[in-house]
Regions:
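Conserved N-terminal entry element of GNAT/NAT acetyltransferase domains
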Residues: 1-3
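Enriched for short, Lys/Arg-rich terminal
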Residues: 6-23, 27, 40, 46-47, ...
Length: 84
């Protein structure tokens, strides 16, 4: 998997402020590799301007927003709800 610059900033924030979120993100990414489009975090295909992207819950407030192309998972955000 790879992280966009924005998603890498989100992950760096969690590494500094909440390691449980980092663990959850890692678990979600492992599950995406194994089970996409099903699995943990209530996977949801996004619509409209975010077409082609998927979302999974990190917690009530925060979402992991990503795409899957061939065998590559690209993470676009992992903080807040569907981006800023």
């Amino acid at each position: 998997h790879r992280f966009t610059e924005s998603a890498a900033e989100d992950l760096a924030y969690w590494k500094k402020h909440d390691l449980k979120k980092v663990e959850r993100i890692k678990a979600l990414l492992d599950d995406i590799k194994a089970n996409h489009p099903r699995g943990i975090g209530k996977p949801e295909q996004l619509r409209h301007q975010k077409s082609g992207l998927w979302s999974r819950r990190i917690d009530r407030e925060h979402r992991l927003v990503y795409s899957v192309e061939e065998n590559t998972v690209t993470v676009y955000a992992c903080r807040y709800h569907y981006g800023r």
